[in-house]
């Protein structure tokens, strides 16, 4: 990204490789605590600078918001956020344990509302057509139709309707609560 923009790349946040994905951790308290151990801001790379965060996704938005707050606390003058996928609007029921629709920030807010919630100057998402094109590019393996349900709410199996989604979400909530 830095090369394409013609700017110097540097790591303003050092990542602890021993802390896992925060979006799948149970409870906001655990996610917030883990984030403090996961990322270490580098003052000289952040203070008095325009900063761009590049992340694979924004799920709930809480982790992203904390990262932005951390950068601003360390003196970033402007914060831009680039996301490598489209807004995550719906849960995946094909193997990824994701939050419910109500917990997904993009299911409830527009891109501009998310930008305001995160408190960033600019927010960029990958366009779904560009992501699909990148996934379907011919190579050793050809994919005719990738599942993009978490981005476009169009599930590839016919039995996925609103009632089924609600049932699956209820099961996940019960599992989280130990029921």
Q: What function would you assign to each model-found segment?
A:
Residues 1-179:
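PRPP-associated nucleotide enzymes
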């Amino acid at each position: 990204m830095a090369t394409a923009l013609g700017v110097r790349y540097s790591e303003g946040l050092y990542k602890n490789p021993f802390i896992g994905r925060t979006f799948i951790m149970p409870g906001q308290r655990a996610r917030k605590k883990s984030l403090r151990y996961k990322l270490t801001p580098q003052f000289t790379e952040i203070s008095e600078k325009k900063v761009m965060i590049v992340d694979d996704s924004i799920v709930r938005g809480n982790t992203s918001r904390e990262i932005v707050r951390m950068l601003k606390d360390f003196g970033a003058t402007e914060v831009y956020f680039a996301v490598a996928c489209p807004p995550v609007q719906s849960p995946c029921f094909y193997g990824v344990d994701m939050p419910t629709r109500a917990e997904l920030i993009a299911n409830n807010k527009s891109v501009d509302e998310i930008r305001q919630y995160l408190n960033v100057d600019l927010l960029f998402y990958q366009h779904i057509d560009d992501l699909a094109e990148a996934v379907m590019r011919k190579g050793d393996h050809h994919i005719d139709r990738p599942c993009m349900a978490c981005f476009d709410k169009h599930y590839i199996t016919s039995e996925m309707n609103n009632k089924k989604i609600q049932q699956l979400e209820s099961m996940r909530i019960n599992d989280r609560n130990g029921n």
